[in-house]
Amino acid sequence: GCMPEYCAGQCRGKVSQDYCLKNCRCIR
């Protein structure tokens, strides 16, 4: 599954974590 930590890790240093979390389909 897709987890917050995973999404944040994917975009770390690229864009804000908030952006990643909102763009993670598996997350609300």
Curated annotation (Swiss-Prot):
Q: Where in the cell is it found?
A: Secreted
Cysteine pairings via disulfide bonds:
2-24, 7-20, 11-26
List the Gene Ontology MF annotations in alphabetical order.
Answer: potassium channel regulator activity; toxin activity
- In which tissues or organs does this protein occur? Expressed by the venom gland.
Secreted listed as a keyword: yes
Q: Which GO terms describe its cellular component?
A: extracellular region
Keyword check for Secreted, yes or no.
yes
Keywords attached to this entry: Disulfide bond, Ion channel impairing toxin, Neurotoxin, Potassium channel impairing toxin, Secreted, Toxin
Major location, coarse class? secreted
About its domains, the entry says: Has the structural arrangement of two alpha-helices stabilized by disulfide bonds (CSalpha/alpha 3(S-S)).
Per the record, the similarity remark reads:
Belongs to the short scorpion toxin superfamily. Potassium channel inhibitor family. Alpha-KTx 20 subfamily.
Task: Give the function comment from the record.
Answer: Blocks potassium channels Shaker-IR (with inactivation domain removed) and hKv1.2/KCNA2.
What's the protein called, per UniProt? Answer: Kappa-buthitoxin-Tt2b
Origin species: Tityus trivittatus (Argentinean scorpion)
